[in-house]
Amino acid sequence: MATFGAPATANSNPNKSYEVTPSPADSISSLSFSPRADILVATSWDNQVRCWEISRSGASLASAPKASISHDQPVLCSAWKDDGTTVFSGGCDKQAKMWPLLSGGQPVTVAMHEGPIAAMAWIPGMNLLATGSWDKTLKYWDTRQQNPVHTQQLPDKCYTLSVKHPLMVVGTADRNLIVFNLQNPQTEFKRIQSPLKYQTRCVTAFPDQQGFLVGSIEGRVGVHHLDDSQQSKNFTFKCHRDGNDIYSVNSLNFHPVHGTFATAGSDGAFNFWDKDSKQRLKAMSRCNQPIPCSSFNHDGSIYAYAACYDWSKGAENHNPATAKSSIFLHLPQESEVKAKPRVGATGRK
């Protein structure tokens, strides 16, 4: 309990989530679950890519550290091959590594850019790796070849990308959203100005490939449909705000079974939403640090999220003595993530 006159100490784990150990030594930049098993990969600013095996017995969770690899500089992003055998990672050393995790093989460099690699995705239908960089290019890689299959010029630095074959959405600086139909990957399908007024932080494609979500630094999410006849279904909503304090939306994840989605933000909270009934299903308690990244496991029974300093307030506000980086696992209740009709309303914009 707080002493009278002294501020209460914010809780680092107010949702009583399971903590994965050991924690990375520096801020966590991405979390990716295997599409086939409960194996979690984290990338971090201490140049590391780490892997844990997660096991569950009823409501109890356990984690076992399995392996790790190093980059030469901070690692920013990660992706899994669709068969769950291989992890890809990229970052400030301007290269992407392929790590044959399940076979115990050594990592090899499979992609190079002229600037940091900010985002990546494996494209299952094409057996290609897509990498997006601050060098204003998107590259497609056949991992057996030294040179990219194709280099696509982007209008600005790549910040984020998402693939749900055949749909790919790329978010760049200056609020550009570039949509690709991967059946014709060398041509832009559509270029859209973000429906949000501020810098794009994250995008994720709809599971049915009919559109995408976009999150911005101004505590807002846009729900966007690609078909011109569906534009009336587009809307934006505010989230990750506390009075006049507005926080970045850092991560968007669709639930693999229910089609609802999670947002995570720099306010330290994660929430579950239903875009079709336009309602929040569950608001979780705020951690005392930002949540920069998150991931559902393959069946949506586990939601992983990181809590750590996100550098949004600069180096001068970073206190290494108190800024612990943590990875937590939350077990979503069905009521938190299952879609439900909005009672007595037609939907709120």
Curated annotation (Swiss-Prot):
Species for this entry: Arabidopsis thaliana
S-S pairs: none
Entry similarity comment: Belongs to the WD repeat rae1 family.
Domain commentary: The DWD box is required for interaction with DDB1A.
A biological process term (GO) from this entry: protein transport
Motif segment (DWD box): 128-144
Modified sites of kind N-acetylalanine: 2
InterPro entries: G-protein_beta_WD-40_rep (IPR020472), WD40/YVTN_repeat-like_dom_sf (IPR015943), WD40_repeat_dom_sf (IPR036322), WD40_rpt (IPR001680)
GO CC aspect terms: Cul4-RING E3 ubiquitin ligase complex; nuclear envelope; nuclear pore
Keywords, in A-Z order: Acetylation, mRNA transport, Nuclear pore complex, Nucleus, Protein transport, Repeat, Translocation, Transport, WD repeat
The name this protein goes by in its record: Protein RAE1
Keyword Protein transport annotated: yes
Amino acid composition bias (Polar residues), ranges on this chain: 9-21
Places the protein is found: Nucleus envelope; Nucleus, Nuclear pore complex
The protein's assembly and partners: Part of the nuclear pore complex (NPC). The NPC has an eight-fold symmetrical structure comprising a central transport channel and two rings, the cytoplasmic and nuclear rings, to which eight filaments are attached. The cytoplasmic filaments have loose ends, while the nuclear filaments are joined in a distal ring, forming a nuclear basket. NPCs are highly dynamic in configuration and composition, and can be devided in 3 subcomplexes, the NUP62 subcomplex, the NUP107-160 subcomplex and the NUP93 subcomplex, containing approximately 30 different nucleoporin proteins. Interacts with DDB1A.
Sequence ranges of the WD repeats: 23-62, 70-109, 112-151, 153-190, 244-283
Region (Disordered): 1-21
Domain of life: Eukaryota
